[in-house]
Structures are given as structure tokens and as C-alpha cells.
């Protein structure tokens, strides 16, 4: 009989263990709302669908964005400075909308629904742009190439154009931070194999983004530069529609997370509760309030108490008044917060200085879509009888990203891990390397421009190829920017996704997108300030319509100097940063994958 009970006990334990292995440990659910079965959901099957979706959507987006500055000058009749500013503002708006998408995703809709809705808006914007360009904007027929400018446009046509491109901005912006996080959701951090796959996913995600833009920067770019704008826009619309269809096909396979509700009240509760206990002195951590350690499957991991921002700990300090309220079941979240709530606020406060330091890098990155293109347009773009569209030079940026992702993952990271006996470079260290490479890119661009001016043809306003210097001299600056992206943007995606609370993962990805957004706005502001200061006393300024009369090289050197100052501040902030500490489903299980301090 004892043997029978022993066997029965072992069988029960094995069944419990098997059930635990069958389901993910991170609280993911399937499309029916049931706990996600590890073998039937997520992993690379779902992630590959998301990567292909990202590639197609990026193709569609850059089919518009990469040549937008030329569309504004050739079709809409804007000068170089205005066109560069408008592209920076539009690109900035794309990523500002990422905050809206992240908020709706984390709070109410969930990542899957948010991705589907904003992708639909994206498709509508592209179709609208294609139709309006064909019917209204490209008149006379065949205009918009380098030789035949288009005529003027009435107000309603201009309004329709801007409505179309800002619908594209809304759709792509709201979708981008959520698709990155949704892809990461397909891997369970509680499983060592899937945890490693999740880290690798972000590199492949950025690679998919660049591979998608490769077609835009070559084939579509060539068509559009030759005046075939409508064909390019329709190809982008078709690619976006295919991306949406493919995304929906993966619905049965995806892993989902329920939205955690609006985080703003939770944050406000911490500040209000701390303010109510302003005169209280917190001496012992064990008096801080933490809810039941065993949390429901659909809630995020609890965060462990950290030092720093000690005044916020007062919100979780249990006073005698709180004890009495708890006994009477009258305790309010506005008078007592959990340690996890407090740590969520601390987490965001610690991230902000790092995030602010990434904005100036995005100013450098923004030059590829504007001033790099205008600089290339003023160089010799002919190879034998073949004309190279200036925007297609960003192909070297894409190839650089692909090469450096491989070099980093396969060579550099393992080498550093063996040499330093660690897990390789941290995200913060990689972002610092990205800033160094960005400085080198601006110095390279400035030197090329200085050399281009020496070869420039004096007083050449309209002639083709206003400098005899080959456009291929731009290759180093594109390659350096591409290398910097691998360290900065991939590092950002991993860092912000890993260091934000479980209920704010899309917000973490949106921080990366918003950095790009503000970088474009700062770029636009910087160009305006530089032109206002430099274009005085009848001087043409640093960035005039005819670059041969300006000093674009000085602007690049200015950016290099500003980025150097930003690097110094970044290093100080990274050393100050403290990594978050999560607690798993088992209260004794604490994540130890990150060091305590930043650098």
C-alpha cells in the first residue's frame, strides 16, 4: 500500500512538472485567452512571420520616405532647406505617433489589435498618396524627374498630399513600437533557449528593417528618381497590403499578453502617496508594502526594491494609519503603493537621462534622409552612361548594417565575452560605441563636403552634376552611420525593452522611436537656427539652394562637436544607471542577467 501511495505521489508530481513545461512561464495566452502552450504557439515560427511583415512594411515606408525630399523639391517646388526641414518634421511625426500606439497597446487594445489597426491606416495612407499623385500632383505628365519640374499646385491638392503622408506617418508610427515588442513576446524569458532567441530577435528585427528598405533604396528609388513616382507609390501600397495580410495569417500561432491598463493613474498614485507621507522617515526596507508574492498568471513580474529616489519609497511605507485602513479593508492606492508600483516610477526616471542622450545621435541619423541626399545630388552621379540616384547611396548604409550585425553577433561579442569573462558588451556600452561611430561619420561627411566644394563648378544653379567629385566619396559616411546603427539602435531596442516594467514593454520600444522623432525635430530646428545665423549680410548661409555657394561641411563639423559633448554626458549617465531587478513566478527566482550598475 505504501508503495502504491509513493507511485501515485510521483505520478502527480510528474504531471504537475509536465504541465509546467507545456505552458510558458511568462503569463502569455493564446488567441482564445487560455495559457499559451509552448510547443503550439510563439517561438521562431511566429517570429519569422513578424520579421517578414516588418521587411515588407519597411519597404513600403521607405518607398515614400527615402525620396520624399526630392519629391518636395521637384514636384512640390520647395527649396533645399524647406524640403529638408519638412522631411525632418514628417519623419519626427512618424515616431511621435509611436507614443500613441504604445499607450493604446499597453493600456487598452493589446499589441496584436494595435498592430492590425495601424497597419490598416498605413495602407489607406499609401493608397491615398498613390491616387492623389496620379490624378493631381504629377502634372504635366512625366514631370518630377531631374529635368522637368512640375507645375504649381492649388491649396486643396497640397492639403490632400499632406493628409496622405501624415496618414502614412500615423499608421507606420503607431505600428512600429508594437511590432517589435510583439515579436519579442513570442519568446519566453523563463526558458533559457527562448531567452537567448529573444536577444537575437532584436538584431534580426533591425536586419529585416534594413533588408526591406534595400529594395526601396535601389529599384523603387531608381523609378522615382526617373520621375515614375506613381509606380513607386503603388508598389509601396501593395507591399504594405501584403504585410498586413501576412500578419493576420499568423493569428492562430501568436502568443498574446493582456493589456495592463492605463499606467498614468498608477504613477500618479505613487507621487500622491509619497507626498502624503512627506515627513515620514523610511529606515527599513522590510516595512515597505508588497502585494501577495504569488501573482496571477496574466500580471507582470514583481520588481524588487532598489536604492535611489528614496523619497518615493515613502509611498510604499506602511504607517500605523495604513495598518488600520488595511484591517478595515479601506486602504486606498492613493495612500499606499506597492514596491512594484514605486519601482516602475523609479525605472522610468532612470531611463530618461539615457533616452535624452540618444536624441542627438538621431540628429546625425536624420541627415541620411535629407542633407546626405542633397549633398549627393550636387556631386557627379554618373558611372559611364548610368545615373545613380542620390538616395540610393543609403544602400551602403543597409549593407553596412547587415555586415556589422553578423560581425558583432558572430565575432565581436563572443571575443569580448571570452576576453572579459562576461556575457559580452552590455547594451549601454554598445550605445556608447554607436555615438563614437556617429562622430566619425559626421567628420567623414564634413571632409567629403569640403573636398566636393573644391571641385564644384562656380555659379552652377541648374546644371547636372554641380561637382566633378564622384558620389562614391559618400560611401564612408554611409558605412559609418550603418555601423553605428547596429550598436546604437539595436542596443536601444534591447535596453528599453528589457529595462521597462512588464506592463510598459511597448512604451520601452516607443522610447527608441521617440528618440528618432525628436532627433528629426532637433535637426529641423538646428538647420533653421544655422541658416538664420549664417545667412546674414547678404550671405547665402551654410545650406543654401545651391550648395556650391554654401558651407555644408561646417554644419557636419558642428554636428560632430555636439555629438562629442553628448558622448561625455552619456558616459556619466550610463555609469550612474542601475539595472532593474525582476522577480519571477517563484519568489526566490531573481533575474541575474544584468549587472547592478550601467557601465
Residue ranges, per PLM feature:
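Hydrophobic transmembrane alpha-helices of multi-pass solute transporters/permeases
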Residues: 2-144, 151-599
Amino acid at each position: 500500500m505504501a508503495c502504491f501511495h509513493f507511485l501515485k505521489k510521483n505520478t502527480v508530481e510528474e504531471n504537475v512538472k509536465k504541465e509546467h513545461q507545456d505552458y510558458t512561464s511568462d503569463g502569455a495566452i493564446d488567441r482564445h485567452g487560455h495559457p499559451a502552450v509552448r510547443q503550439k504557439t510563439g517561438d521562431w515560427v511566429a517570429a519569422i512571420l513578424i520579421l517578414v511583415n516588418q521587411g515588407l512594411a519597411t519597404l513600403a515606408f521607405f518607398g515614400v520616405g527615402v525620396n520624399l525630399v526630392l519629391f518636395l523639391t521637384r514636384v512640390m517646388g520647395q527649396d533645399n532647406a524647406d524640403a529638408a526641414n519638412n522631411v525632418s518634421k514628417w519623419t519626427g511625426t512618424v515616431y511621435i505617433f509611436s507614443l500613441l500606439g504604445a499607450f493604446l497597446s499597453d493600456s487598452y487594445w493589446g499589441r496584436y489589435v494595435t498592430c492590425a489597426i495601424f497597419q490598416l491606416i498605413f495602407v489607406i495612407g499609401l493608397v491615398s498618396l498613390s491616387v492623389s499623385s496620379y490624378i493631381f500632383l504629377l502634372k504635366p505628365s512625366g514631370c518630377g524627374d531631374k529635368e522637368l519640374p512640375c507645375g504649381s499646385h492649388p491649396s486643396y491638392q497640397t492639403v490632400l498630399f499632406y493628409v496622405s503622408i501624415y496618414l502614412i506617418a500615423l499608421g507606420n508610427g503607431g505600428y512600429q513600437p508594437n511590432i517589435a515588442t510583439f515579436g519579442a513576446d513570442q519568446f519566453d524569458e523563463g526558458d533559457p533557449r527562448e531567452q537567448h532567441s529573444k536577444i537575437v530577435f532584436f538584431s534580426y528585427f533591425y536586419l529585416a528593417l534594413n533588408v526591406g528598405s534595400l529594395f526601396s533604396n535601389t529599384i523603387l528609388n531608381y523609378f522615382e528618381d526617373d520621375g515614375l513616382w506613381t509606380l513607386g507609390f503603388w508598389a509601396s501600397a501593395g507591399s504594405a497590403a501584403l504585410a498586413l495580410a501576412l500578419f493576420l495569417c499568423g493569428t492562430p500561432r501568436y502568443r498574446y499578453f493582456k493589456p495592463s491598463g492605463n499606467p498614468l493613474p498608477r504613477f500618479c498614485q505613487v507621487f500622491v502617496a509619497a507626498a502624503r507621507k512627506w515627513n515620514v522617515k523610511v529606515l527599513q526596507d522590510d516595512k515597505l508594502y508588497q502585494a501577495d508574492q504569488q501573482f496571477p498568471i496574466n500580471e507582470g513580474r514583481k520588481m524588487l526594491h532598489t536604492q535611489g529616489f528614496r523619497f518615493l519609497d515613502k509611498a510604499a511605507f506602511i504607517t500605523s494609519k495604513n495598518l488600520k485602513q488595511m484591517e478595515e479593508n479601506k486602504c486606498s492606492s492613493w495612500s499606499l503603493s506597492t514596491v512594484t508600483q514605486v519601482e516602475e516610477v523609479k525605472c522610468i526616471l532612470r531611463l530618461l537621462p539615457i533616452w535624452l542622450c540618444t536624441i542627438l545621435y538621431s540628429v546625425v541619423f536624420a541627415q541620411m534622409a535629407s542633407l546626405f541626399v542633397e549633398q549627393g545630388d550636387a556631386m557627379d552621379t554618373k558611372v559611364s552612361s548610368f545615373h545613380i540616384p542620390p538616395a540610393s547611396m543609403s544602400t551602403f548604409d543597409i549593407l553596412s548594417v547587415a555586415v556589422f550585425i553578423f560581425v558583432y553577433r558572430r565575432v565581436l561579442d563572443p571575443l569580448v565575452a571570452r576576453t572579459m569573462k562576461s556575457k559580452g558588451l552590455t547594451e549601454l556600452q554598445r550605445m556608447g560605441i554607436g555615438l563614437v561611430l556617429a562622430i566619425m561619420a559626421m567628420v567623414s561627411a564634413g571632409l567629403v563636403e569640403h573636398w566636393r566644394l573644391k571641385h564644384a563648378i562656380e555659379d552652377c544653379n541648374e546644371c547636372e552634376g554641380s561637382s566633378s567629385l564622384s558620389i562614391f566619396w559618400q560611401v564612408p559616411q554611409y558605412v559609418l552611420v550603418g555601423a553605428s546603427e547596429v550598436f546604437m539602435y539595436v542596443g536601444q531596442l534591447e535596453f528599453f525593452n528589457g529595462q521597462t516594467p512588464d506592463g510598459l514593454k511597448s512604451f520601452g520600444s516607443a522610447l527608441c522611436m521617440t528618440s528618432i522623432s525628436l532627433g528629426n525635430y532637433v535637426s529641423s530646428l538646428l538647420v533653421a537656427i544655422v541658416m538664420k545665423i549664417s545667412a546674414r549680410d547678404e550671405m547665402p548661409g551654410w545650406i543654401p539652394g545651391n550648395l556650391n555657394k554654401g558651407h555644408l561641411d561646417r554644419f557636419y563639423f558642428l554636428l560632430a562637436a555636439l555629438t562629442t559633448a553628448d558622448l561625455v554626458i552619456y558616459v556619466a549617465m550610463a555609469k550612474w544607471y542601475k539595472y532593474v531587478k525582476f522577480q519571477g513566478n517563484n519568489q526566490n527566482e531573481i533575474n541575474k542577467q544584468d549587472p547592478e550598475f550601467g557601465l
